[in-house]
């Protein structure tokens, strides 16, 4: 089954939708250049209301280690690094927080994909650019065997195609479940339904 990550949770209504739809992951953005950024206090309140079956992920981009360790106190259970963080920094985050790390990479060309596979992290993510809402070139990922999150330009209309073509471990969505810059519960539900339909169709093909 393809895991789902709803990213950019900002409001109690977003948490209510997560608790109803049960994605495997919910992302909370701590990078202050993002319009989806929330404070540690806000994140702590939201995470407290999140069902335990949904893993809260803190999203960071080229931020100092103390910022990440402080945010770890909010209740996040994974760290997502979305910048130019190197292996040494990833290892320090894991050591200081005790949390698993998702390292995100921007898909530019075959070389960027190949280089990303040399990084040691708990999971990797391939994106078209942090929060850009633009789809990456999926053909560059067809030969990747490692489990990964697929992000960038996904919505209910194309996530099924992505799952059929690439079979990622997880799909990550933010702008694709928004209306007017806010999470839209109806779009969140349609996205989950599209993922589950694609999973079911894929399983039938394997039989």
Indicate where each model-derived feature is located.
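Conserved N-terminal beta1-alpha1 strand-loop-helix module at the mouth
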Residues: 1-126, 131-207
């Amino acid at each position: 089954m393809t895991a789902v990550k709803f990213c950019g949770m900002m409001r109690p209504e977003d948490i209510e939708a997560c608790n109803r739809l049960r994605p495997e992951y919910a992302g909370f953005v701590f990078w202050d250049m993002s319009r989806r950024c929330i404070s540690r206090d806000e994140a702590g309140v939201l995470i407290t209301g999140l069902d335990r079956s949904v893993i809260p992920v803190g999203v960071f981009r080229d931020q100092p280690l103390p910022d990440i360790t402080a945010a770890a106190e909010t209740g996040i259970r994974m760290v997502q690094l979305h910048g130019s963080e190197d292996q040494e920094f990833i290892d320090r985050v894991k050591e200081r927080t005790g949390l698993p790390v998702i390292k995100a990479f921007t898909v530019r060309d075959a070389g960027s994909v190949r280089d990303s596979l040399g990084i040691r992290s708990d999971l990797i993510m391939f994106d078209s650019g942090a929060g850009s809402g633009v789809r990456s070139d999926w053909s560059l990922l067809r030969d990747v065997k490692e489990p990964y999150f697929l992000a960038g330009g996904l919505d209910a209309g194309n996530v099924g195609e992505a799952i059929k073509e690439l079979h990622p471990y997880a799909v990550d969505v933010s702008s694709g479940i928004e209306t007017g810059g806010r999470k839209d519960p109806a779009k969140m539900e349609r996205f989950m339904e599209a993922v589950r339909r694609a999973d079911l169709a894929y399983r039938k093909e394997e039989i």
